[in-house]
């Protein structure tokens, strides 16, 4: 099952500004789709019901892409959208983090209905990634923005209830970039602290969702460069993958062992990754 990676461009990184494809053995397959609507691509998620790839584009739109690399749905340009990460929620809708508005919205998978704000505007200083727990709870990483402002925390929300977010994680060594839910239900976060520093410590950190305590720290242990970690995804076989500056790094989640660079590409500047059969 190929790995698809969004490669940043512009202020988000000197990458290719494209959706790139790799084999699981690391071979680079090239650009998955050539389309002018895709520029500085960001979040990705797969709708397994329809086998469609949903992509957040820096052109202020969300696209749905078929397995043959064709855009089949398009929100059209939404003024000021500035999307970040994307994930499907328990109700089947596609949720998108907004960088400028600092909130999360929901879209129907048809991409032709009105946008719904599921959290208030400016709910965090800078959203860095989010995912839904096994019980439907929403976990949101609050990190440092490009201007150097923000905080470093993980918040928990119960949608549909009065808004009473709880600060799940306060870890002095954490500066989150993305967040995923592990098979065991815990929160897994990619981190670079201090954010943007040349000597930043990059890691993947696992937290218990009940009380927020740090369970484990995943480190490259010399098997990968692991600079500027960003998007996280679990593969169907349970391995954990994290995209970074010049590589995609794998971890055996059961043992915590780093598997090294699964794929390498100079200037990758990866933002998000998914596993998408095509």
Describe these PLM feature segments.
Residues 27-35, 70-77, 113-121, 163-170, ...:
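A short beta-strand motif characteristic of beta-propeller blades
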Residues 1-30, 276:
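An edge-strand/N-cap motif at the start of beta-rich repeat modules
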Residues 16-20, 61-64, 102-106, 152-156, ...:
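A short loop-to-beta-strand structural motif that recurs across blades of beta-propeller domains
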Residues 23, 56, 65-66, 107-109, ...:
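Structural recognition of the beta-propeller blade-terminating site
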Residues 14-16, 35-49, 78-94, 100, ...:
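Beta-rich, blade/repeat-based domains predominating
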Residues 26-28, 48-50, 69, 92, ...:
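Structural signal for glycine-centered tight turns and loop->strand junctions in beta-sheet-rich domains
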Residues 4-7, 54-55, 96-97, 139-141, ...:
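Residue position within the beta-strands of beta-propeller blades
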Residues 245-278:
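Blade-level signature of beta-propeller repeat domains, shared across WD40, Kelch, NHL, RCC1
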